[in-house]
């Protein structure tokens, strides 16, 4: 609590001393008041130490951390790669689906060779649906990586 009061009063006095809108008479009065007061060397040392601590604290409070952007960028890249990998797992499902469609075609033609043309057209239609799902999954995976 006391450190907050010290920080606030110190910042206010620094702003008043460095403000361009302050009248020169006010600044002279503040400077002369400080120069007239004399204290022991210990008090002067404490005052300069406190000023340096306050300045360091305010600098640290408003300073941007150098490593935060690098960590954030690395986390974004890891997330993109995980998203692409997770979405690419769906491509194996499309490959399995295409294999099952043509396995069913071969099984159907083996059971009833007379329906070969009709079964082949249904197999091509099933292949197109499964491939569309696979391409959609690939598109999602690439969007997760490159956007």
From Swiss-Prot:
Mode of membrane association: Multi-pass membrane protein
Boundaries of the annotated transit peptide in chain numbering: 1-66
Annotated organism of origin: Neurospora crassa (strain ATCC 24698 / 74-OR23-1A / CBS 708.71 / DSM 1257 / FGSC 987)
HAMAP family, per database record: ATP_synth_c_bact
UniProt-listed CDD domains: ATP-synt_Fo_c_ATP5G3
Alphabetized UniProt keyword annotations: CF(0), Hydrogen ion transport, Ion transport, Lipid-binding, Membrane, Mitochondrion, Transit peptide, Transmembrane, Transmembrane helix, Transport
Name under which the protein is recorded: ATP synthase subunit 9, mitochondrial
Domain of life: Eukaryota
Any Pfam family hit: ATP-synt_C
């Amino acid at each position: 609590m006391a450190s907050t009061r010290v920080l606030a009063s110190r910042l206010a006095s620094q702003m008043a001393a460095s403000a361009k809108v302050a009248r020169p008479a006010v600044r002279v009065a503040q400077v002369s008041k400080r120069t007239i007061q004399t204290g022991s060397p210990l008090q002067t040392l404490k005052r300069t130490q406190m000023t340096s601590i306050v300045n360091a604290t305010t600098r640290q409070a408003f300073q941007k951390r150098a490593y935060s952007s690098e960590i954030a960028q690395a986390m974004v890249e890891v997330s993109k790669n995980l998203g692409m990998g997770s979405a690419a797992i769906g491509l194996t499902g499309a490959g399995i689906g295409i294999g099952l469609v043509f396995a069913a075609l071969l099984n159907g033609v083996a059971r009833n060779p007379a329906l070969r043309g009709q079964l082949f057209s249904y197999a091509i239609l099933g292949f197109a649906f499964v491939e569309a799902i696979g391409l959609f999954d690939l598109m999602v995976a690439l969007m997760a990586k490159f956007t």
